Amino acid sequence: MVLIRVLANLLILQLSYAQKSSELIIGGDECNINEHRFLVALYTFRSRRFHCGGTLINQEWVLSAARCDRKNIRIKLGMHSTNVTNEDEQRRVPKEKFFCLSSKTYTQWNKDIMLIRLNSPVNNSTHIAPLSLPSNPPFVGSVCRIMGWGTITSPNETYPDVPHCANINLFNYTVCHGAHAGLPATSRTLCAGVLEGGKDTCKGDSGGPLICNGQFQGIVSWGGDPCAQPREPGVYTKVFDHLDWIQNIIAGNTTATCPL
């Protein structure tokens, strides 16, 4: 009986430790250097750290989140490690920025989207290539890929030298509506994460892509604080719902309006 109790206690301790450890793995593992050719990093002139991510959708345009807007944005493309420079890395600044609303008046559950026109086009290369816009809306149950240079621990922040990637699941919006106070009953956003916690986007990942079944379906918007908590999936701007606005802006119709 004593031996059984000892073994049972050891099992409980192991399970407890495993649960706590998994809660710290926010960004997953290092991304393969060849899987994020479309991923860009946003920073400001005086900053030493990237404050957001973005997605290159063609040679001249980047899609990110409105919350990522800053006065002096710089954009780095073709990067993997912050310590080792790729030969084909390129830097750009915005020529124009477009929003559904002013970046100061967007809501955390609606219209968190920013379309950036680069000051000059980029060329495809070993580490740079655009990601196509989605041809179909996502469906609940999809496996989705997240990536970025954001913190891999929370609430204490640890920023990696390379982007981290993880797989999460797409849930019905009602899951996020129940998890986060203040969310409206309907929204042009997606709800994605891992219900047991442990995998999530976090500070520094905003604006980056949510790729579901190979299609660019979401833009990292916001989530719980601390990040990666159980039953608190993240909220992502739904790209498919904004396709008409994006395509109109790119085509030159700069007065196009976003969906209500």
Swiss-Prot record:
Glycosites: 83, 123-124, 156, 172, 253
Removed propeptide positions: 19-24
Keyword check for Repeat: no
Alphabetical list of Pfam families matching this protein: Trypsin
Cystine connections: 31-165, 52-68, 100-258, 144-212, 176-191, 202-227
Record function comment: Snake venom serine protease homolog that may act in the hemostasis system of the prey.
Name the record gives this protein: Snake venom serine protease homolog KN4
Source organism (scientific name): Trimeresurus stejnegeri
